Design a protein with these regions (language model features):
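ATP-dependent carboxylate-amine ligase
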Residues: 1-97
């Protein structure tokens, strides 16, 4: 069976003046290789994202964690990227990844 791929993208605060452009590139790449994208942080409102069930925007890492607990199983691959300021490391820690 094919595994479902979920990508969690948090804001990457260290990118400087190209921040929006780089976040857009990250989103576009994730959109090509994953089944679902979970976004956290205010920059995603400046990014051209699909308004579908496969793209969800959350206010913080705790909301994403609660969602992930309800959908993760042995047939799911989880990819997480973001700066420590958006606490993406806590998602991995709490899920024991």
């Amino acid at each position: 069976s094919t595994k479902k791929k979920i990508c969690v993208l948090g804001v990457m605060k260290e990118l400087g003046e190209r921040s929006v452009e780089i976040h857009q590139e990250m989103y576009d790449y994730a959109n090509e290789i994953t089944d679902q994208i979970l976004l956290v942080g205010d920059i995603w409102t400046s990014i051209d994202v699909d308004k579908t069930d496969s793209v969800l925007i959350f206010d913080d890492h705790e909301e994403i964690y609660d969602y992930l607990v309800s959908v993760l199983d042995e047939n799911t691959i989880l990819l997480v990227k973001g700066s420590r300021s958006t606490r993406m490391d806590l998602i991995a820690d709490k899920l024991k990844l």
